[in-house]
């Protein structure tokens, strides 16, 4: 049976408050566990950190994605070694390089994929500003060159990066659908055309929240068609700290991001279940129609 695993970003557990108060790592992990997340997004460039975090998650029956930011092909090698040691359901790679031409990208993509394939580890390339995938059109050209490239789709970066006009045009929907159709995981954040991260409950943001829910639903359906029967899709709630999060004049945030992460978790799980239920209903109707046809033929 296909599964959805909803993770919480450990980076998003940073508070960066004016008073300097931060949760300890132990508190963060316990909060993620107690809130019912399936796991966490874990930065894997620090071996000791990865070991500590994954030990906790494993002990509590949770899983994780290994996050990394290589600036060369070789910089992925220690990440792979850490994943081989500690495990991960996949590597999420932010390509911390900015080639000007598509041809300059090819050695990076081919090198990273070769290393991951040789190690038998799934590799997803994240869509993100100030990375190789910073521009929507450039990333679409990457997909032209590598049609089987597996993306982690953080759609917020393209909405604000290209400053999509509202309402979203059919053309822009089609471009985003093409990104989504290559997505094997999602990072969850809601943007507008001029803000990278919106508060989920504010009334003035509901049209953008609805848009992202629509795209994620499309993505779930797309993935379910492409993935194997026992496949696992990951969705990382990644509501970042300031300066991703908006703050008031006092430096404190305008909303409770931890509470919002829980809302996002529940919302995407409901979205996933709705897709699954609809597929079950369609299959039941199909079987009923076939039986009706067989009965009619026998008569």
Predicted regions and their residues:
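Catalytic domains of carbohydrate-active enzymes, especially glycoside hydrolases
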Residues: 24-47, 82, 86-87
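Conserved beta-strand positions in the central sheet of alpha/beta enzyme cores
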Residues: 41, 66, 91-92, 152, ...
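Conserved, mostly hydrophobic/aromatic
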Residues: 32, 40, 83, 123, ...
